Amino acid sequence: PDSTKVLFTNVTSNKDHRKQKYKDEYVINVFNDKLEKLWEKKIDFSVADKDMIISQSQISSDGDVFILVKEKSKEKRSKWCPSFDYSFLKVTSNGDIEKIKIKIENAYPKHAKLSIDQDGNCYLLGYFTEKKKRDVFRFEHGIFFHKYDSNGDLVLQKKHKWEKEFYVKLKEEYNLDKVSSGADGFYIDGISIDYLQNSISLISTHRYQTFGNSNNGGKGTTSRYNYANHIIISSFDFDGNLSWTSCLEKKSNPMSFLSNMIFGCYNDNIYLIFNALKKLG
C-alpha cells in the first residue's frame, strides 16, 4: 500500500547451553524509499517455535508493523477444530507492542491472511471452523472478514458460510475412500485489494491427498500423491459483504502441487499466474 516504506524481518536463535534455554529473537527493520533505516525493534519469543509460528508481517503507511502469528491453544477442543489460535501484533516505531487475539463467535479461525490498505486499515480474512460439528465434507465451514483501524481496534466483523452446492461439488469430484481428510483443505495464497472497484478478494488453493498401493518384491508400500486441483476466489466489498465466489479448476500434477502463484487485480479483473508443469514422457 505504501512504496515509501520497506520492511525487513529476520529471526535469530539465541541458545544458552549453560541454562539450557532457547529463545527466538524476531528482528524488525523499517527503511524509507532510499533504504535509510528509520527504526529497529527486537521481539523475544520465549515460548519457542513449537508454540508460536509467525505467519505473515506487513507495514502500514504510518510505519507500523503488523505481525500475524499462530499459537498453540491450551483449550481442549473437538478433533475437527484447529488446535491453534490466531493473533496479530501491532508494533509501532516507538517500540510499543499490542497483541490482538482473533475471535469469531461460536467458531475458530483455521486459516488467515492480513492485508493493509492505503489508509492504514488492517483487513484479516480467512476460513473458520464452527465449534458445533456440522455434517459436511469440509472442515472449513465458511469465510470470516475482519477490519481493524490503524489503532488496531476492531471496526467490523462478518462471517459467511459456504453454500451447500459448494460442498456437493467438491464431494462429487473426489473419491472419498482414497482421500486423506487430514491433508485436505484450503490454503490461502493472499489478498488482493482493488481500490478502483472498492473490492477485496481472498485467493486460495484447495488441496487434497490421494494414496496408492504398490507391490515391490512382495513388500507392499503406500505412496502419497498431492494435488492442487482448484483455485477459490471470494470477493467482498469494503464493508465485508460477499459479492461473489468462484471455483476454478487448476490443471496440475504432483510436481506443481506447491508451486507459487502470482496474482493481481485491475479494472475489476483478477489475474492469476502459476506454474502448471506438464508430465514428461
Predicted segment positions?
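Loop/turn-rich, solvent-exposed surfaces of beta-rich toroidal or solenoidal domains
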Residues: 69, 143, 188-224, 228-232, ...
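Beta-propeller blade signature
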Residues: 23-36, 81-96, 138-154, 219-241
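Structural signature of eukaryotic scaffold interfaces centered on beta-propeller domains
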Residues: 1-5, 55-62, 113-119, 128, ...
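Karyopherin-beta/Importin-beta family HEAT-repeat alpha-solenoid scaffold
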Residues: 40, 57, 80-89, 97-100, ...
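Active-site-proximal structural scaffolding
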Residues: 21-24, 50, 81-84, 107, ...
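Short, conserved, GDST-rich strand-edge loop motifs in beta-rich repeat architectures
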Residues: 6-24, 70-82, 127-142, 205-227, ...
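Solenoidal tandem-repeat scaffolds enriched in leucines and small polar residues
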Residues: 1-97, 115-125
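Surface-exposed loop and turn segments in beta-propeller and other repeat-based domains
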Residues: 42-50, 101-107, 155-183, 243-256
